[in-house]
C-alpha cells in the first residue's frame, strides 16, 4: 500500500498535524475563530505592506508625497493603502476579542501560550505605532514625538535613551528611516512568535467553553473547523473591504492629511482608536514617570492573570459573579477608550482617573476575590 504523503512527508506532516488531523474539542464556539482570523489579518497586512513598501520613500521630504503618489498614481494604490490602514484596526479588534475570550474562558491557564500571546500583543502594538509614523502627517509626527518622549521619564538613562531612539535631538529623518526599518522587520518577528504560540497551544490542545478536559470528545480540525474558519474569513474580509471602500478614513485622524510641521502643534494629540484605552490610563496620572508605569502596567498586567486565578473552575461559564465583573471590565475599557479621545479637561480627567483605578482593581483585586467567594458559595 502506498504511503500517505500528507502523514509521512516531513514538512506536510507538520501542516497536517496543525491544520488537518489536529484533534479539536467538539464544542468550541465562534469565540475560537479569532485565532485564525488574526492569522488572516497578519497575512493580509504583510502582503499589502510589502506592496506599499515598493512605492514608499522613507525620507522626511518625500514620505508624505510618496503616500499621496501611491494613492493617485499606483495601480489600485488607494485600495492597497486603505486595506492596510483599516486592516490594522481589524487586527486590533480581533486581538482584543481573542484576549477577552482567553480571560473569560480561563485559557490563560495554558501559561506558555498565554505569555507568548501577551508578547505578541506588545509586538503588534510596537508595529502599529512605528507604522503610524510613516505617512509623516501632523499626527504621525506629534504622536511619535509624544510617545517616544515618554522614555525620558526613565530615571538616569531616560534622556540618552530618547536621543538614541530619535537618532538626534528631535524626531527627524533618522527617526523616520529607522521606524520604517522596524515596521518592515516586526511583522516577520510576529510570524515567528505566532508559530511558537501555536506550538505551545498544540502541546495542550484547545480549551473549550465549559473549561473541562475534552480528551474524551475530540473531532478532526478538517473539515469541521476549516469550514467554520472560512466563514469567519469571509465575514471579516467583507467587513474590511466594505470599510476600505465606503469610508476608508472613518477611523483615521483628519490631522494626518496635513504634512508634518514641527512648528505647529495639533490642538488634540491622540493616537489611533486602538491605543486610546492605554493613552487614557497614561493621562490619568499627573506624574510623568507614574503615567509611563501605569501605561506599561495596563498591558503587562495580563502576565499576572494566570497567577491570580483563585477559582476551582477554569471558565467563567458557571461563575455569575465573575461574569458581572468581566462585563464591567469590558464596559470600563470602552469608557477608557472614549475618555482617551476627549480633551484633558473637566469632567474627562476625573472620569479617566476613576476608570483607570477600576481597570486595575477589577483585574488585580476583584477577580481573585470573586472567584474565592464563588468557591465558597458552590462549596468547592
From Swiss-Prot:
Matching entries from InterPro entries are given as: Cyt_b/b6_C, Cyt_b/b6_C_sf, Cyt_b/b6_N, Cytb/b6-like_sf, Cytochrome_b, Cytochrome_b_C_euk/bac, Cytochrome_b_N_euk/bac, Di-haem_cyt_TM
Which organism was this protein described from?
Icteria virens (Yellow-breasted chat)
**A molecular function (GO) term:** ubiquinol-cytochrome-c reductase activity
Q: Does the keyword Cell membrane apply?
A: no
* Co-factor(s): heme b
* Protein name as it appears in the record: Cytochrome b
Q: What is the recorded membrane topology of this protein?
A: Multi-pass membrane protein
Transmembrane parts of this sequence? 34-54, 78-99, 114-134, 179-199, 227-247, 289-309, 321-341, 348-368
Q: What CDD domains does the annotation carry? A: cytochrome_b_C, Cytochrome_b_N
The annotated subunit structure for this chain is: The cytochrome bc1 complex contains 11 subunits: 3 respiratory subunits (MT-CYB, CYC1 and UQCRFS1), 2 core proteins (UQCRC1 and UQCRC2) and 6 low-molecular weight proteins (UQCRH/QCR6, UQCRB/QCR7, UQCRQ/QCR8, UQCR10/QCR9, UQCR11/QCR10 and a cleavage product of UQCRFS1). This cytochrome bc1 complex then forms a dimer.
Give a GO cellular-component term. respiratory chain complex III
User: According to the record, how does the cofactor bind?
Assistant: Binds 2 heme b groups non-covalently.
Amino acid at each position: 500500500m502506498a504511503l500517505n504523503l500528507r502523514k509521512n512527508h516531513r514538512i506536510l506532516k507538520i501542516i497536517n498535524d496543525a491544520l488537518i488531523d489536529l484533534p479539536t474539542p467538539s464544542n468550541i464556539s465562534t469565540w475560537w475563530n479569532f485565532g485564525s482570523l488574526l492569522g488572516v489579518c497578519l497575512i493580509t497586512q504583510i502582503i499589502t505592506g510589502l506592496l506599499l513598501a515598493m512605492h514608499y520613500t522613507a525620507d522626511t521630504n518625500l514620505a508624505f508625497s510618496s503616500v499621496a503618489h501611491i494613492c493617485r498614481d499606483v495601480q489600485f494604490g488607494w485600495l492597497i493603502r486603505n486595506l492596510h490602514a483599516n486592516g490594522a484596526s481589524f487586527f486590533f479588534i480581533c486581538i482584543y476579542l481573542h484576549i477577552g475570550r482567553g480571560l473569560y474562558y480561563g485559557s490563560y491557564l495554558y501559561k506558555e501560550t498565554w505569555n507568548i500571546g501577551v508578547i505578541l500583543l506588545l509586538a503588534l502594538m510596537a508595529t502599529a505605532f512605528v507604522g503610524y509614523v510613516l505617512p509623516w502627517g501632523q499626527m504621525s509626527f506629534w504622536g511619535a514625538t509624544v510617545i517616544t518622549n515618554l522614555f525620558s521619564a526613565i530615571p538616569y538613562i531616560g534622556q540618552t535613551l530618547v536621543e538614541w531612539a530619535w537618532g538626534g535631538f528631535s524626531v527627524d529623518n533618522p527617526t523616520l528611516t529607522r521606524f520604517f526599518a522596524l515596521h518592515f522587520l516586526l511583522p516577520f518577528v510576529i510570524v515567528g512568535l505566532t508559530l511558537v504560540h501555536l506550538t505551545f497551544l498544540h502541546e495542550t490542545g484547545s480549551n473549550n467553553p465549559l473549561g473541562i478536559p475534552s480528551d474524551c470528545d475530540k473531532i478532526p480540525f478538517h473539515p469541521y473547523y476549516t469550514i467554520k474558519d472560512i466563514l469567519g474569513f469571509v465575514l471579516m474580509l467583507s467587513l474590511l473591504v466594505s470599510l476600505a471602500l465606503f469610508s476608508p478614513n472613518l477611523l483615521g485622524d483628519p490631522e494626518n492629511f496635513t504634512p508634518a510641521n514641527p512648528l505647529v502643534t495639533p490642538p488634540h494629540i491622540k493616537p489611533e482608536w486602538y491605543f486610546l484605552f492605554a493613552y487614557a490610563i497614561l493621562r490619568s496620572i499627573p506624574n510623568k514617570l507614574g503615567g509611563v508605569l501605569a501605561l506599561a502596567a495596563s498591558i503587562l498586567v495580563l502576565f499576572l492573570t494566570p497567577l491570580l486565578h483563585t477559582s476551582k473552575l477554569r471558565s467563567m461559564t458557571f461563575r455569575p459573579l465573575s461574569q458581572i465583573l468581566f462585563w464591567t471590565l469590558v464596559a470600563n475599557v470602552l469608557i477608557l477608550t472614549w475618555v482617551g479621545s476627549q480633551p484633558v479637561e473637566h469632567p474627562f480627567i476625573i472620569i479617566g482617573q476613576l476608570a483607570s483605578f477600576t481597570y486595575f482593581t477589577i483585574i488585580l483585586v476583584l477577580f481573585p476575590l470573586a472567584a474565592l467567594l464563588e468557591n465558597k458559595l458552590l462549596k468547592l
